[in-house]
Amino acid sequence: MTFEFAKRPTIKGYPELRWTGKRPYESTQYYPAQLREQYGETINGWINKIFWGDNLQVMSHLLKDYRGKIDLIYIDPPFDSKADYKKKIEVKGVGKTQTDTNSFEEKQYGDIWTNDEYLQFMYERLVLLKELLSDTGSIFLHCDDSRNFYLRCLLSEIFGEENFRNEIIWKRSTATGLATKRCGTLHDTIYWYSKTENYYFEMQYHEYEEDYLKRARKDENGRMYIPIPTGNPGPRPNLYYEYKGYLPHANGYKWTREKMEELDRQGRLIFPESPDGRIQYKQYLDEMKGTKLQDIWLDVYPVNPVAKERNGYPTQKSEALLERIIKMCSPQNGLVL
């Protein structure tokens, strides 16, 4: 069984990443794959699955049943960090002496590549992942500063720059003293692309930061609120009008005159003392879920050495990080790879 891939049309002036030995990846064969493990109880005929083997062959295997059906993909590929990653394996029943230990290190994978090998490796897998993704699906690619600039070019070439959604900065570690002649590296990068413009998204929130809460005020009923501008973020000439002697921002108000009058009756407007000032709006804290999630994630911590979820894998990512991504871009009962 052969699977053919639709080739993205060549657009004049559209950038494309080139490297020595770049080979088009326009089809693949169906491969049998080894279903290694299953987790949980069957739900509507589905059970969580883990495949072991070369991921290119496993994805080719998945095309038969899941082409265009996967709602969310998260990948944490090799970073080309020029290092070998090892996991400490405990040996039961072996006591420590001065000359031996009760554990040994097992190599998990080597992350040392030449440029052309690495780029071809990632290119072929991203093409396959696009084929697996549903039209409302998203892909999140986790990387660091080793090759992130190349990976973004590849993602834009395959998924289209118009489907780029965010470059997420995740603070993965605390300060380190390893860097002596440059700034220390504290973050990873997560690129988010969608398959189309019609992608699933559920806004996520996090707790209010202390600096934000310092701006809060209390109304006559004891409710806490934040004063926010009433100006429109974009030019709206039809919403530019005077209200009770006060002019809006140059873009106009956010709301129609009728809506402003309704907010005024509710006591939601704050009028300035100066005639040249601008009206503000009371945004009550108890009406909001928190602060809307932005593209810098400082509140999701890496797996600490004594965490229950830690399995010893050298580049393990936290469950909290994956939970946030899944809640944000996978519908209920969605299919996640």
Question: Language model features by range: what are they?
Answer:
Residues 1-337:
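Core catalytic lobe of class I
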